[in-house]
Amino acid sequence: MESQQLSNYPHISHGSACASVTSKEVHTNQDPLDVSASKIQEYDKASTKANSQQTTTPASSAVPENPHHASPQPASVPPPQNGPYPQQCMMTQNQANPSGWSFYGHPSMIPYTPYQMSPMYFPPGPQSQFPQYPSSVGTPLSTPSPESGNTFTDSSSADSDMTSTKKYVRPPPMLTSPNDFPNWVKTYIKFLQNSNLGGIIPTVNGKPVRPITDDELTFLYNAFQIFAPSQFLPTWVKDILSVDYTDIMKILSKSIEKMQSDTQEANDIVTLANLQYNGSTPADAFETKVTNIIDRLNNNGIHINNKVACQLIMRGLSGEYKFLRYTRHRHLNMTVAELFLDIHAIYEEQQGSRNSKPNYRRNPSDEKNDSRSYTNTTKPKVIARNPQKTNNSKSKTARAHNVSTSNNSPSTDNDSISKSTTEPIQLNNKHDLHLGQKLTESTVNHTNHSDDELPGHLLLDSGASRTLIRSAHHIHSASSNPDINVVDAQKRNIPINAIGDLQFHFQDNTKTSLKVLHTPNIAYDLLSLNELAAVDITACFTKNVLERSDGTVLAPIVKYGDFYWVSKKYLLPSNISVPTINNVHTSESTRKYPYPFIHRMLAHANAQTIRYSLKNNTITYFNESDVDWSSAIDYQCPDCLIGKSTKHRHIKGSRLKYQNSYEPFQYLHTDIFGPVHNLPKSAPSYFISFTDETTKFRWVYPLHDRREDSILDVFTTILAFIKNQFQASVLVIQMDRGSEYTNRTLHKFLEKNGITPCYTTTADSRAHGVAERLNRTLLDDCRTQLQCSGLPNHLWFSAIEFSTIVRNSLASPKSKKSARQHAGLAGLDISTLLPFGQPVIVNDHNPNSKIHPRGIPGYALHPSRNSYGYIIYLPSLKKTVDTTNYVILQGKDSRLDQFNYDALTFDEDLNRLTASYQSFIASNEIQQSNDLNIESDHDFQSDIELYPEQPRNVLSKAVSPTDSTPPSTHTEDSKRVSKTNIRAPREVDPNISESNILPSKKRSSTPQISDIESTDSGGMHRLDVPLLAPMSQSNTHESSYASKSKDFRHSDSYSDNETNHTNVPISSTGGTNNKTVPQTSEQETEKRIIHRFTSDRILPSSESNSLHHVVPIKTSDTCFKENTEESIIADLPLPDLPPEPPTELSDSFKELPPINSRQTNSSLGGIGDSNAYTTINSKKRSLEDNETEIKVSRDTWNTKNMRSLEPPRSKKRIHLIAAVKAVKSIKPIRTTLRYDEAITYNKDIKEKEKYIEAYHKEVNQLLKMKTWDTDKYYDRKEIDPKRVINSMFIFNRKRDGTHKARFVARGDIQHPDTYDSGMQSNTVHHYALMTSLSLALDNNYYITQLDISSAYLYADIKEELYIRPPPHLGMNDKLIRLKKSLYGLKQSGANWYETIKSYLIKQCGMEEVRGWSCVFKNSQVTICLFVDDMILFSKDLNSNKRIIAKLKMQYDTKIINLGESDDEIQHDILGLEIKYQRGKYMKLGMENSLTEKIPKLNVPLNPNGRKLGAPGQPGLYINQQELELEEDDYKMKVHEMQKLIGLASYVGYKFRFDLLYYINTLAQHILFPSKQVLDMTYELIQFIWNTRDKQLIWHKSKPVKPTNKLVVISDASYGNQPYYKSQIGNIYLLNGKVIGGKSTKASLTCTSTTEAEIHAISESVPLLNNLSYLIQELDKKPITKGLLTDSKSTISIIISNNEEKFRNRFFGTKAMRLRDEVSGNHLHVCYIETKKNIADVMTKPLPIKTFKLLTNKWIH
């Protein structure tokens, strides 16, 4: 069999390297490997390669060593060798060996005779001997022996003289490695098979097919020994040969057994790689086959993922299924199951189409492809069924529409082809004649053809479901075809002109008719094999004929190129003319929807989803066939590319593949972490990490900043370290695109050192995963170490370094080695490592005294980099030291904050640890804390000073008994102090040094004196202390006392009548800074008020006799005027002060130096004269009482985040309060929701439903109001872009709980040319509303509240404006013209105001009060208008109802509250929650609103603590140092300040006038969000939260005379603002009810207190006059206007007739104007005592008691 196949190729040269056996293999029962031909070729190639590598060597080296034979070869016999012959390793029987010659000379070998070796070999030379067969047995080969005299000397003669009788077999290659033995055995077995010895090869069961002879065994052994040297044999083979060196059969048996186990896996892989499916078999069977293969491979450890499996499956799809390649090629995450769903869908569709056709017989061996047979046909590639070719697809499908002209193309006369042809007619080109056939052109062909077409023939197409032809001369019974849609393999439409019949007249004189479609738009005339099968005709490609099922041959098949053809000579021509067919056009009904249109209509879904939905009828109205899918594959939607753009995917392992060529320390990853805030200056704020790609060795370096020179120093260090320590050069450094890496300095450094920087792409942090993961791991370790050890935060980098040391020593699960091992370093000696934070005792080698202890408690951090020592932290010295002189402290707590220092014997160390703590805690305060059994959780870390030292005079007085302290009490206090365990603070001073172990020079802190009042919650008493400051102005405002005030400031003497006091420093909490308070006796604690005995405090005798009475200024007027002034003050909500005797100052204050005022600083309580005058004796409060006086930031408030962060040192901001006015671009706080927030992504189902309902309500209202012109839509290109306004929907929840949607225009981007900037949108002023409410209470008015729905839409718009339609209309490319004033337009408010104003005046009989917009009145009703909200006031409720009826005639008016009840009625009017009972009272508050809003601000509240007594305390200054923040952090804090101050301003403006000073001061610092400012803001919000239930209380006035009384109380605080600006404040009262307040910084810099007071009064007069006019318009009663101030000098100037005083004053002009205003407007100027001046809360921070005293009458 083998020789027969070889004889068919006589032209192959025996000496050629490619002369390999390509025939089929021997019978399967003799071939246990079942190796395919492709594998044989691989083996032959490997053999050829091995043989070609053999070179000519000396004879002594040609024979391999044989350890199994002890006898050497005879010396006379030349050893076998590979001589210098061209035909290497080829042998034949023509070359005989000497008789009886033994190849190895072994005595046991069977003797050989000539011609007894394999005749299939030809020896390369006479000296190269090969194994022989014994002559007694005869040759086992089936071929005869060649002639003996035929010898070949070289390749040329071999090629020329070779005869067909010589048979050549390629020998196996030489074995060169034990690892190559499995592959070598395969070639060895193939060698035996080709030598006709396949029967002796063991089968699967280990036994040969036939017995093996001795000669064959000898041949087997000798061949094995030649080509398999013993030194290259595997161990298991050597083990077999050591037992029996001739047992080659056992080696073959075991090798085959091993190969069988690998064959299944190899077959599965080959099968999976060569999958083919076209629908000819059931889809279920194909799926089962594929899944079984994948499962077997997965079970054997060969994992085939979904992506690879899907690619292999799709590569083998053909026919109808090939389309899945294009629809699936972009789906990276598809699964095998999803792919088979699509395959099943197409298969089921095919089966349904076949069932609808007539049954016909088909040859299953020939028909392999099925295609769709329904109307929407497909023309896939032609599949030629040539069993000897694997690539049978049409290669020229792209030329289907490019038919070229070829008029001289020859054709084939198929009559000369025999019916019994067994070989395919192969035409290489049109001019190639094969087997004597002649090509002639068909006479019926009148159509141009392409170059690769066989003219005059029909192309046999197994994939086409219909027959198509280009020429009309063969179509019978042609007719138009409006209902047939045909697409090609690329799913492109093929227009069809006509349909008819194609009639064949075959060789057996039978006629057959097929349906044919006419189209000139194809490259070939196609004959569908499916339609032939329908008429019982099949194509047999083995015989190359068309035949019927009974075997009758009808016509021959010609193979030309890659395709098969049938001659057109069998077609019968028709009489139809060509123009008749070509004039047939497609009906209009065949028009299809373009795919881009459907893609856009269906929300830009992908083509596969759309087709699947159409197939399953999930979309109705049209079918899949109604869509033109021809462009679906190649269509790129630009909107999808933009809207669905994603980042590229990171392929796992791609980095390793790219970087695997680098050696250790050649590729580094680096990244920077930081900053870490709130650290001392000596502690690093950043660290930079490096990771080696190969070894994963890590380095970390501390950084104090990210400047380029700092980064450059680190790079220089790490490169030098790697070069010197590891003898390596860094080639690449990967880093992100931070400015610290991309700067020019570092770039030049890397370029100079030949290092390639590898940057990540934009927004691709995942590409920097190595460095990012390292930083995350180190930070996790750092947080854990600090938490476990309790060490302070400034040691954070020590924790990082400790973690790096340990991580470099731990083995990686992937590499099974540590980074140190990869780097060639020794492992970490754990005996030298201590737990992080381990308590130790360090030897002090330089104690202060020889008798002092020499041990200092400390905490171990990490091994030293620079020595064999250990880095240890010493809390008592606030330093870290590098030492080996330490002892581990056994059995002690490991945490610093749990360390029991009292258990140690180092008393001196204990004193050092607690020194700073003792500096700010007095003994009496500890005694009070113990007496009350109060545990203070206050953290003193912010109050610690570096090495504080108590002033000796203060400490001596603090611990010595005084006259006011009983000795027994002092003794008890001392005992309690000694028993108190004082713990070292967690945070340290910012000036800690880590390099010097010696204590720094100690400094003392200067005690400060401040004024502190008691709270409601304390219970303990503390004295009020005057805060001494430079007094530049007297309190009585007389200029003659200024010099005396200055003398007092420098005076060292006080009154001698006071009890001695001792000043001790205390901790600052609750909004106050460090203060010094005097110790007093209990008898002194009841003393409250002390007057400053200075010349500027001298009062008239009347005031001295009765301080608690208000004393009007006496003039020359009558007693009636004096009574008027008294009546003005009579019913005001002023505090009631009991008379108290004056007290004197203590002598102890004589020793205290004056403290200079920081008058250039912004202060929450500057040092004005009225503020400097404070009380001395008051209740003294213990330290623990301050624990709820919150003065900590958000970070330090929450105990879980005690380690706060300091601002990074990146950007400096200068504190300029004036910058607040310049900034106009601060984004307002957005309280509304967008559509996606309210509906699309809203997870609250109930809220979402309410917003949807509101949305539909708004849309209906827009349509109802005819907001836009619905008759015409405009194209966007036709309209000027300036007149196009963007629009959007916004959603919010109203105060009453209803949900509202509003369609608004984007007025913020409206062009200035589209509106009149002079028009204004007016709303009612808050003072007008408060005035109307106050008059309503006094006159028993009814209050009715209305709302006009969609108010702006009632106003027409004059300008020509266009908007984009709402989204639900689906007309994004169109515009509509506005007809109404849409919300959001800049002119809408003004248009609505003019519309409603005109209607109220003309239709309702109202008139607008002059100077007060949106306040309308008539004789019975007053209306306050705020956009669409109306508040009606009238004495008769029917009058309100009449107005309501008229409003409803024009507007959609809704009654919110009619107000007809005589009981208490609750209103919600413009944000105010009002409780009103006619004729009795009115309460104004915002409790519900604040309860809802404040928690949403994310402010750290303290709900469980005691309430604050005041929003701030006096004596606290805002530090004006430069603020250093990162840009993002700065913007975040400014935004937070905006939210907090915005809410506070809203509340203060509405009714909390007592907070206006604090709000105004903090509002000036919105752009300066320092930690201190944020702390104050949090404290303010906390106070608002604690007092959210407070209300502004009004009671109905009961005047003696029917008059209205309007009073303004004024006050000023001189020079307590930056740049010596003064704070002024005014409170307005109507009939004793506070209706408004104002606190602001004076616009002018005043030179004295009197000038500041004059400025404050002059600022209040204009508003006072306007309010007077409004009151007279609304209530026709006489009005009395009063002006109250506590500055007598101001009053004397105003009422003085001596004009000479004004000439010597800077404020003379203002004073003159003020005097004219007072006299011209009949203002009554009165004096009010400072202690009763409620306007004092508008100008300065007050002590808690004073604050409550001045506000509890009107806010409670």
UniProtKB/Swiss-Prot annotation:
Key words, A-Z: Aspartyl protease, ATP-binding, Cytoplasm, DNA integration, DNA recombination, DNA-binding, DNA-directed DNA polymerase, Endonuclease, Hydrolase, Magnesium, Metal-binding, Multifunctional enzyme, Nuclease, Nucleotide-binding, Nucleotidyltransferase, Nucleus, Phosphoprotein, Protease, RNA-binding, RNA-directed DNA polymerase, Transferase, Transposable element, Transposition, Viral release from host cell, Virion maturation, Zinc, Zinc-finger
**Annotated disulfide bonds:** none
Q: Where does Mg(2+) 3 bind?
A: 1611, 1653, 1686
Identify this protein by name: Transposon Ty1-BR Gag-Pol polyprotein
PANTHER family, alphabetically? Answer: TRANSPOSASE, PUTATIVE-RELATED, TRANSPOSON TY4-P GAG-POL POLYPROTEIN
* Gene responsible for this protein: TY1B-BR
Task: Give residues annotated as binding Mg(2+) 1.
Answer: 671, 736
Q: Report biased composition (Basic and acidic residues) as residue ranges.
A: 1044-1053
Supply the source organism's classification.
Eukaryota, Fungi, Dikarya, Ascomycota, Saccharomycotina
